[in-house]
Amino acid sequence: MMARLARAEMPRLRQMLFVAGAVAALEAVNRLTGVSGSLLVAEIIIMMVFASSLNLLMSFGHMVSFGHAAYFGLGSYGFALAITRFDVPAEAALVFGPLLAGIGGLVFGALCVRLTEIYFAMLTLACAQITYTVLFQWYDFTGGDTGLTGFMTPRFGLSEANFASAAMVLALVCLYVLWRVVHSPLGLAIRSVGQDRYRAEALGLSPRRVQLVAFVISAFFAGVAGTLFAVFHGNAFPDYAGLGFTLDALIMVVLGGLNSFLGGVWGALVYTLLKNFVPLMTAHWELILGLILLAIVLVMPHGLAGGVKRLAGMLGWGALR
Amino acid sequence: MTQLRSDLILTARGLRKTYGQFVALNDVNFDLRGGEKHALIGPNGAGKSTFISCVAGQLPGVEGAVLFRGRDIGSLRPHQLAHRGIGRTFQISRTFLQMTVLENMTAAYVIAADSWTSLRRRVLARQQDKAANMLRIIGLSQRAHERVLDLPLGERKRLEFGMALAGDPDLLLLDEPTAGMSIKERHHLMDFVAERIDATGKTLLFVEHDIDVVLKIASRVTVMVRGGILVEGTPAEIAANKEVQAVYLGEAH
Ligand SMILES: Nc1ncnc2c1ncn2[C@@H]1O[C@H](COP(=O)(O)OP(=O)(O)OP(=O)(O)O)[C@@H](O)[C@H]1O
Ligand SMILES: [Mg+2]
């Protein structure tokens, strides 16, 4: 009892201060740097949710997905299709994005968790390619490569700054739920299977069932991000389910730092900034971006979150996990 | 001395397991009575671990039948067996290395209580209290907040043993629970295991290379050689058995 209190209650205040500080900083940038700043903040926030959804799988379930964009894309299309094909009012259609992504996660996840490690990863890739192909080629329904456009005013007509603020609130809710998942009995089960499936099994867990639950939760939140992205731009394209977004998510998680809850958040922040600013500075931006990523990984083997934690430790400001 | 008769808790009939051409278990028949502390001994490669894994449902492609409390458990998955009362440890200990000792034990209790789908902090706190209590019992309280990866091998084994107890199993399978421990640690752990088995009336099947520990703890001993059972008996009978002596003298150690 004592041990638990000493460990869990003390840093809670610091955690809340940290969150409040981060929100204040983002909101300040959002309000003080004009339209381009707001657009950037909104993108960062959406990517934070997307990367954090993958982080649940990778950092805690030790499941590497090479096809996470499938659920991002399904989120966009669930929302857009509900409006364009089923005449659902746009506000109500918001739930169909995460819902479709969750269902996609259930179907593909049930398939993928039958395999482990690299075979699991290859199956997730295959599932994502199937999703992409369907979105790309089913012209009558999904609009094919021209995607779905013009079905709503982007951002529901909100100003860039107000949309970014609204996205921030939603992102906070998502991250809080993910945090609760990680620190719940379910989270412990997900981590158990991730670290030693045979031990977990011998204790009485069905590894596949646990992994499927993690997969569906992860897909659902990727779907939230995808839905937000579709609202942000007022469209949905097959590329949202493509390799580009899959790769972005992977880079953000690894850059941010595996085995850390905030890995996806830090990764999304830094990677989105780099991706937006490096091309402005040099024509060889892909090379420069690659070198910067390489440097970060070399300097901080535990990613940005690990680096931040170490820095916080040096400043005597621990417990930033 | 008369053996106390009680129901058979585990029965294996005609167990056979092959790895390609290699026969790891060859037509093994085995009976285990409730309340026994049964040692499984034999030279390296005899098939002891293979047998344990067969019972725990962790091996594919096993021929023959395994009955647990009279029911065929051959088709059950390991996690189902765990909930029916079979707990085990592995020869090379398996724990959640990146988690703390307390988290490991809490995970074991959460899983045993089948409350892993819960999102409630209160559920976690309740299992954590049970876990902290078990850590006290197995003497790992001081280590509660250390990562298992930073623990010496002997303590990892002790932790794994505690985790196997979380489900309060009727049958405890321990595969070399004292490997890598000092002689003192070995006796300490196995005395504790024996006490606990006696106090709770559960059944123990354990693989052990230290013959002193076996003779001290076990109520029955089975000797395996080359995938088969050589002989089964009381510790005294086994110690006096010429064939067993030949097998052990013929071994390199
Ligand atoms: N996965 C496997 N593939 C091939 N052969 C295996 C496999 N597992 C075990 N064996 C072989 O089966 C035989 C029995 O192995 P087992 O681990 O059951 O022996 P053991 O009695 O536990 O020995 P030890 O005292 O060394 O632990 C050994 O010869 C081993 O090499
Ligand atoms: Mg063995």
Predicted regions mapped to residue ranges:
Chain B
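Glycine-rich phosphate-binding loops of nucleotide-dependent enzymes
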Residues: 2-253
